[in-house]
């Protein structure tokens, strides 16, 4: 019997119904599946019934087990198994062609990995298991108290959907929190919206400023980095009141403020 390791945040999904619902939520047109965290291979097994799969597993002790379990699939090249930290591999790309990500993510790296998937031009979308609170943040809409920078980033490329909750007793060992499965099917790419990757990175930094102190108004947050008179002029132009908080805006308004600040900056050069 394999004992889950705390250092890897391992909680193995054993609920057959939840596994089936994850498979059903993957778009029919998905061709290449990348899985992060093959674990004991329960989800991997279900994925291989429909798709070609490339799985990343960080736990060396599980690699030999997975090689044995999926020996036939490895031999006929329907399955590719990679040992290592997916976050480190992401620097050079998880896959050399378009793919759809499926993952039961360790809670401690879930947000970071989803943001990587959002930024990855080759990633067409994802179905991911995360802590319920994280799921609510990614899927939050303008006006929700959970709405934040990561909600905006997800909204840029498509609509992040909260699919279903998964209780703690669906896992072995059972985590101390409730989990949830979310899905993002990308409908836009970075160059559909931004001039280049530099502008996109600048926009992400801009969002960090906007949400730096959620209880303060967006005007107060932005005025720590930008001239207040210029901000007031932009807000007036966009017909926005200065007492708005960041969670009350949407991507379109954030982008309009960002673009106007950029135009002002270029004029002053």
UniProtKB/Swiss-Prot annotation:
Keywords: Cytoplasm, Methyltransferase, RNA-binding, rRNA processing, S-adenosyl-L-methionine, Transferase. It holds the Pfam family RrnaAD. It comes from the Bacteria. Gene3D superfamilies: Ribosomal RNA adenine dimethylase-like, domain 2, Vaccinia Virus protein VP39. Its EC number is 2.1.1.182. It catalyses: adenosine(1518)/adenosine(1519) in 16S rRNA + 4 S-adenosyl-L-methionine = N(6)-dimethyladenosine(1518)/N(6)-dimethyladenosine(1519) in 16S rRNA + 4 S-adenosyl-L-homocysteine + 4 H(+). It is an enzyme of class 2 (transferase). GO terms for molecular function: 16S rRNA (adenine(1518)-N(6)/adenine(1519)-N(6))-dimethyltransferase activity; RNA binding. Transmembrane segments: none annotated. It is found in: Cytoplasm. InterPro entries: KsgA/Erm, rRNA_Ade_diMease-like_C, rRNA_Ade_Mease_Trfase_CS, rRNA_Ade_methylase_Trfase_N, rRNA_adenine_dimethylase, SAM-dependent_MTases_sf. S-adenosyl-L-methionine binds at residues 11, 13, 37, 57, 85, 104. Its main location: cytoplasm. GO terms for cellular component: cytosol. Specifically dimethylates two adjacent adenosines (A1518 and A1519) in the loop of a conserved hairpin near the 3'-end of 16S rRNA in the 30S particle. May play a critical role in biogenesis of 30S subunits. Belongs to the class I-like SAM-binding methyltransferase superfamily. rRNA adenine N(6)-methyltransferase family. RsmA subfamily. This is Ribosomal RNA small subunit methyltransferase A. It comes from Campylobacter hominis (strain ATCC BAA-381 / DSM 21671 / CCUG 45161 / LMG 19568 / NCTC 13146 / CH001A). The gene is rsmA.
């Amino acid at each position: 019997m394999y004992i889950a390791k705390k250092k890897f945040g391992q909680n193995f999904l054993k609920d057959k119904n939840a596994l089936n619902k994850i498979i059903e939520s993957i778009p029919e047109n998905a061709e290449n599946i990348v899985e992060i965290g093959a674990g004991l291979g329960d989800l991997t097994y279900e994925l291989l019934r429909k798709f070609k799969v490339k799985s990343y597993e960080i736990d060396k002790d599980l690699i030999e087990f997975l090689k044995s379990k999926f020996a036939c699939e490895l031999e006929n090249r329907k399955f590719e198994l990679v040992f290592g930290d997916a976050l480190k591999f992401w620097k050079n790309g998880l896959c050399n062609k378009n793919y759809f990500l499926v993952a039961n993510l360790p809670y401690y790296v879930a947000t970071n990995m989803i943001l990587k998937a959002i930024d990855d031009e080759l990633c067409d979308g994802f179905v991911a298991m995360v802590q319920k609170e994280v799921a609510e943040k990614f899927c939050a809409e303008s006006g929700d108290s959970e709405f934040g920078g990561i909600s905006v980033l997800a909204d840029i490329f498509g609509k992040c959907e909260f699919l279903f909750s998964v209780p703690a007793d669906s896992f072995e060992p059972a985590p101390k929190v409730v989990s949830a499965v979310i899905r993002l099917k990308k409908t836009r790419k970075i160059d559909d919206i931004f001039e280049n990757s530099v502008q996109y990175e600048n926009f992400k930094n801009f969002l960090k400023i906007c949400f730096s102190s959620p209880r303060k108004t967006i005007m107060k947050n932005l005025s720590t980095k930008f001239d207040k008179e210029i901000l007031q002029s932009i807000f007036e132009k966009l017909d926005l009141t200065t007492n708005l908080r960041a969670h009350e805006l949407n991507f379109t308004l954030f982008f309009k403020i960002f673009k106007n600040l950029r135009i002002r900056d270029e004029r002053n050069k």
